Amino acid sequence: MDFSDPGTLIANLETASHRARLYQTRVIRKTLGYLLCNPEICPELGQSTQRDPFAGKHTNKTNDSQNQDLRSSERSALVLSPTGSGKTFMGLATASILQRTYGLRVGWTAMRRNLLTQAADENVAFGFNVDMQTISMFDRSPPQVDLLIVDEAHHDGAMSMASLHSMMRPKLVLGLTATPFRQDRIKLCFEKVIRDVSIRELIREGWLSKFDHYCLDTYSPQSVAQCWLSDPQSWGQAAAFFRFKSEADECARMLTQGGARAAVVDGESDREQQIADYMNGKLDVLCSMLVLAEGFDCPQMKTVFCRPSSKGPAVQICGRVLRPFPEFPVKRIVQCRDTNFPFTRIADPRYKFTFQDGAWKSLTANPNIEEIAKQMEQQIAQPLTPSTSMSWIQRNSRTRSRGSIVIPQ
C-alpha cells in the first residue's frame, strides 16, 4: 500500500484538527507520522519514524508466538494518554484522515461491548462518520481491515488480541490506552509508544477537574459506607472500588441500610441498566471491582473511593472522577493510608485531608502563607506600635490555618 505524497493527507489533517485540542493535534500528527513512516507530517519525530530494532523484544517468553503475531503488522503505535484526554476522539480523527486520504478499511476492536458502542456513538457525535467495522476481540471470523484500532489496549486482552491479529493481518495498528503499566505485554508489542500530555497538565489547563484528596485510616466496606453516609449531600454521587465482590456486596448492603441507593456492578449484573440509572440520578453509589475502571464516563460523579492498589489501577480508578462537570468544579478522591500508590503522586490536589479523631483535618498549608509572609516583612520593616500590631493580628487571624477541619464543598 502506497503511503507516499502526504499533501492530501496534511490537508485532511488540518480539516480534522480544527476541532481538536492542541495536544490532541500533536498526538494525531505523531501517530500519522509514525504509522506512515513520514517525518514531513510530524517533523519533531525525526528519525524516530524508523522502526525501533528493540521494539517488542522484551516480552513474556511463554507468549512469544502471540507477540510475534501482534508484530506482524506493517506498522503499529500505541497512544498512551490519560483518562479524559479524548483517546476516542484522537483514534477516530486518525482513522478519518487515513480513510479519506487512502481509502483504508477501518476496524475498531475492544474487550467490552460498551466500548464498541461508545466508539460508534462518538463517531457520529463528532461528525467523523468513519466507515468502520466494530469488532469483538473474541470474533472467530473478523472482517479484513487495513487499519485496526484497539481500544483499551492493555494486558487483559493479550491472548485474544494476538489471535485476532493472526486472522486479520492489518497493515496498520493503533492502540489506545490510559494504563501506565510498564510491564504490559501488549504495550511492549507495539513498535512505538506515543505520549504527549499528563494528568497534571490536563488539570492545570482545565481539561480535567481539580480535586481534593481524602485519606481514611483503613479501607473497608464499613469505612467507605460510614464515610459516605456521614454526609451524603457533600460526597454526592460516588463510585466505590474493591478488590473482591464480597466487599462490594457488603458495602452496598450497608449503604442501602443507611438509606442510600446503591448497586453492585460486576460481570453478571445488568451493567448498562445500572449505569443508565446512575446517570439519571436513580442511584447514589456504584460499588464495583475493576469492571467500572474502563469505559465508564460520568462527569456528574463527584467522589471516587479507590481501594489500596498499585499505580495502574489507582490511575484508572481515580481518573473516573476527573471529567469536568460545571456544578462540581472540584471533585473528591478518597484513598487510605495503606495504599501503595497515593494519587497525589500523579497530580497535586487543591486540598489534602486526613481522618483523625473522628473528623477530617486539613494537611494543606495556608494558601495565603506567602502573602502573610510578605506582610510580616513589611511590618518588621516599620516601627511597631500597639495599633498596627493589633490590626495585623486581627486581619490574619481570619485566614484558614493548618489543621482546620473545615471541608470545602
Locate the predicted segments by residue.
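Post-DEXD/H (motif II) to motif III coupling segment of the RecA-like Helicase ATP-binding lobe
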Residues: 158-207
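Conserved pre-motif I regulatory segment
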Residues: 2-77
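Conserved two-lobed SF2 helicase motor
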Residues: 127-138, 280-294
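Conserved interdomain linker/interface between the two RecA-like ATPase lobes of SF2 helicase motors
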Residues: 195-246
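Conserved segment of the helicase C-terminal RecA-like domain
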Residues: 321-347
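A short beta-strand element within the Helicase C-terminal
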Residues: 296-309, 316, 331-335
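Walker A/P-loop
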Residues: 44, 72-93
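Conserved helicase ATPase core of P-loop NTP-dependent helicases/translocases
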Residues: 261-290
